A protein has these predicted regions:
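Structural motif corresponding to the early beta-alpha repeats
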Residues: 78-104
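Active-site groove signature of glycoside hydrolases
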Residues: 116-139
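Feature marks short, surface-exposed loop/turn motifs that line or immediately flank catalytic pockets
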Residues: 11-13, 60, 87-91, 134-136, ...
Length: 309
């Protein structure tokens, strides 16, 4: 992959997101112009820190437009871009919108959204992923959609899928089975893995062993692992570092993890996140963090209860 730390723009392409500490990070100035300026600043800082993979999605508000404009200005010549389809942003740039996004994994939605992504990102788009592929969505059983994906793959675009929810492992294993003429349909998988929710680990190890690229999202559990008085504060203090670095370093300690995504909303955060590649966690710290794991159903219920802010 392009770099061991990537940058996801979920927090920067729209005015609200599910993230603890967002009010502190962004304040009240969240106009489109303000968010685009912030996004450019963070992209500049990420690139300067060595980050070469950027991850967006159709549902991340104007993230694709912000990123496309930044790239067209020549500011990230070595950046590899991945985007996702399957959710549509409905927030209308309102902080109080009742519905921020809606999921639709139909073939019609794919055709519409890949055209939109290509219009905004052009030739910069290298990887296109199903957004939150789950067993219950039926996406892996939709033969018309899979045939459409195959034709897109044959045109040269790399395909992947992301997962969410307590049954991530089952979705990963199911997605790995899809093949075209004996070759994998999906070259990458992007999943949630963190010290609170490590249940997808064995399936991700299987994906890595099979030659797929493994990208990790939500390594900081939507900000829950970033506080000095949070679950990783003690470990970070003993190691003389910060909780965000510990959270990301815990992912890098997994031999199957290729890229861990930073969800930074500020320049300071992305610089700190990028430096996590230099943090080596001792065995006793890793063992202590293993004790933090929650039952997947509890973790995802807690996540679902987080407010958009």
């Amino acid at each position: 992959m392009a770099s061991r730390i990537g940058l996801g723009l979920a927090a920067l392409g729209r005015p609200v997101y599910i993230d603890v500490g967002r009010d502190r990070d962004l304040g009240s100035e969240r106009t489109r112009a303000a968010m685009e300026a912030r996004c450019r600043e963070v992209l500049d800082a990420a690139y300067a820190a060595g980050i070469r993979y950027v991850d967006v999605a159709r549902s991340y508000g104007d993230a694709e437009a912000f990123l496309g404009a930044w790239l067209d200005a020549g500011d990230g010549s070595e950046v590899v871009v991945g985007s996702k389809w399957g959710y549509t942003y409905l927030g209308g740039w309102r902080l109080d919108a009742d519905v921020q996004e809606v999921k639709d994994l139909s073939v019609a939605a794919f055709r519409r959204q890949i055209a939109e992504s290509r219009r905004l990102l052009g030739d910069h788009l290298s990887l296109y992923q199903i957004h939150s592929a789950t067993i219950e969505s039926g996406v892996f059983d939709d033969r018309e959609l899979l045939d459409e994906l195959r034709s897109v793959r044959e045109s040269g675009l790399v395909l992947g899928f992301s997962t969410s929810g307590p049954q991530q492992a089952e979705a990963i294993v199911r997605g790995l089975r899809e093949r075209v003429d004996g070759e994998p349909l999906f070259s990458t998988v992007q999943s949630t893995w963190n010290v609170l929710e490590p249940s997808a680990g064995p399936a991700l190890a299987e994906a890595h062993a099979d030659g797929r690229g493994v990208l990790i999202k939500e390594a900081m559990a939507n900000g829950r692992l970033g506080a000095t008085d949070g679950p990783l504060g003690g470990v970070a203090g003993r190691l003389g570092t910060t909780p965000d670095r510990v959270a990301l370093a815990a992912v890098h300690a997994q031999p199957w993890a290729d890229v861990v995504l930073s969800g930074a909303a500020t320049v300071e955060q992305v610089r700190s996140n990028a430096s996590a590649v230099d943090v080596m966690l001792p065995d006793d710290a890793l063992a202590a963090m293993n004790e933090l794991a929650q039952p997947p159903a509890r973790y995802w219920a807690d996540r679902a209860a987080l407010p958009w802010r």
